[in-house]
Amino acid sequence: MSVSIDDYPLLAQVPDPEALRTLPAHRLPALAKELRHYLLHSVARSGGHLAAGLGAVELTLALHYVFNTPEDRLVWDVGHQCYPHKILTGRRERLGTIRKYGGLAGFPKRAESPYDTFGVGHSSTSISAALGMALAARQAGEQRKAVAIIGDGGMTAGEAFEAMNHAGDAGADLLVVLNDNEMSISENVGALSQHLTRILSGRWYHQLRSGSKEVLRRLPPPVHELARRTEEHLKGMVVPGTLFEELGFQYFGPVDGHNVDALVEVLGNLAHQRGPRLLHVVTCKGKGYRPAEQDPIAYHGVGQFDPEQGLPKKSGGSLAYNQVFGRWLCAMAEQDPRLVAITPAMREGSGMVEYARRFPERYHDVGIAEQHAVTLAAGLACESVKPVLAIYSTFLQRGYDQLVHDVALQNLPVLFAVDRAGLVGADGPTHHGSFDLSYLRCVPNMTIAAPSDEAECWRLLSTGYHHDGPFAVRYPRGSGPGAALPEADLDPLAIGKGVCRRRGRRIAVLAFGTLVVPALAVAEALDLTVADMRFVRPLDEALIRELADTHDLLVTVEENAVAGGAGSGVSEYLARAGLDVPVRHLGLPDRFVDHGTPAELLAEVGLDEAGLQRSLQGWLDTLPGASR
């Protein structure tokens, strides 16, 4: 249910950016106040990403006020901060559906609105995309603007600097807005810097600077260089932009990101300039809601809550898989001082908070730098250290070349704890872990395991840790069936060996990972065999052969793309071994699955208990003759 717009009279007058641009500028601060309040109370009812959006209210207003969107292109990085943008671009009444099945996406999505110029979800892509748009406009002789809005976290990734290096070299007409919510500005330096930014971004200074450059070009090179260095030195005393200037960008800032009047003035000036330029905006995550300002991590992504009371206390229940990993990590680190853990900016999400507190000297958060994280692990492994890299399935895609070239090719003992495997839920297709079995299974030297419950996850993590080669354990988001952890047991399991969980007749279900549990429930009803395969590479070929010899049909079940996944490996083995038994595959379809709850999405793709029973019953009914 959406918040009533009747309580927000000024916001009600702004259904879209075109209406926004008709407002007098002096009304923008009041509009920002209403927009922030509307956002807070909407997300409190629906759940979603909160702190980032609260911190980007004034910036979003100023960008849409100054630029002629959607003709001018705004490209948001990651997209957590896009909720104010969605409210202002005709989707206000549907905000209550955000991240819900069939509702608005939690990130910018091209199919959803012409104002969403580029689909995002992963970090640090905005500058590359906006640069492409800027170069396309230049090639077509069009005057539209391209603006990338990127956070200080997104700036830690190499792709951002690769794009800036290219933009500077190409002299592209590109504005990058750096939304810095980690930096604080001291009062005096901040005031001086903002005053200087207004001067430097103004038309008078821009015209003077362009004219002086033309004059300096006619002077001897030493004089030209002296003038350039003098300007850099004077700006550098109050402006921290030397790095960006070296990449070919004009730097402006820092500017108070919550002063909408100043933002409109500076952005208005920059809109009339050309070439690569960067505006450094300083904001506060969670701005305007004290609990979110004090704990932006807790309020990054929230469920439903009462803004007057704050977030509800978490209730007990089964451990989430990331908590299982966190406990295992601490237990193994206590036993083995060689263990070193790595995360690419996902300490909380990967369950590593306690480990980081207890073992800070053996913990590396490398920032949003998945490529570096993988090769860092490879370098550690070369020196007899035992690296454990905790990484989401969807983000491991970003370090794939390093996994192949730097880890697997050298057969280095790196343990990949692959979190968020399968359908993750509300974050949708940018974050589903749909492909890891497919892209890992084809890599020589890789061992891949998929646990069916918490206890098996614990045992397989230990197995991978003790293995002398690259090893991936993939597990889902959220809780498992509630299996007790074997916390005193850190010994390995036999690699490449599954276990038959139930003996039935006619159909043998070869289940991988979390789908073992619903497969067992269906097998009880239909009297089928179920094997918990545990390993995707190497497969338990002896078990597959035995089941092929004693059943009329084999069915593989996995929460991964069917194409190239575990089931494909089973079919390859059957063909290689000359085993003439029919086989069917159940897994994720050949399309990007949208957002919703995991239960809704599993039902959509036929991998919930009801869907499995439908498929298995249908195949059972078509089998000819008696069982073997």
Swiss-Prot record:
Summary of subunit composition and partner proteins: Homodimer.
Query: What HAMAP family does its record include?
Result: DXP_synth
> What is the protein name stated in its UniProt record?
1-deoxy-D-xylulose-5-phosphate synthase
**Binding residues for Mg(2+), per the UniProt record?**
D152, N181
Record-level Gene Ontology MF annotations: 1-deoxy-D-xylulose-5-phosphate synthase activity; magnesium ion binding; thiamine pyrophosphate binding
What is the organism lineage in this UniProt record? Bacteria, Pseudomonadati, Pseudomonadota, Gammaproteobacteria, Chromatiales
From the UniProt record, report the name of the gene that encodes this protein. dxs
Q: Give the record's pathway.
A: Metabolic intermediate biosynthesis; 1-deoxy-D-xylulose 5-phosphate biosynthesis; 1-deoxy-D-xylulose 5-phosphate from D-glyceraldehyde 3-phosphate and pyruvate: step 1/1
Entry binding sites for thiamine diphosphate: H80, G121, H122, S123, G153, G154, N181, Y289, E370
Q: Which family does it belong to?
A: Belongs to the transketolase family. DXPS subfamily.
Q: Which organism is it from?
A: Alkalilimnicola ehrlichii (strain ATCC BAA-1101 / DSM 17681 / MLHE-1)
Q: Note how many cofactor molecules are bound and how.
A: Binds 1 Mg(2+) ion per subunit.
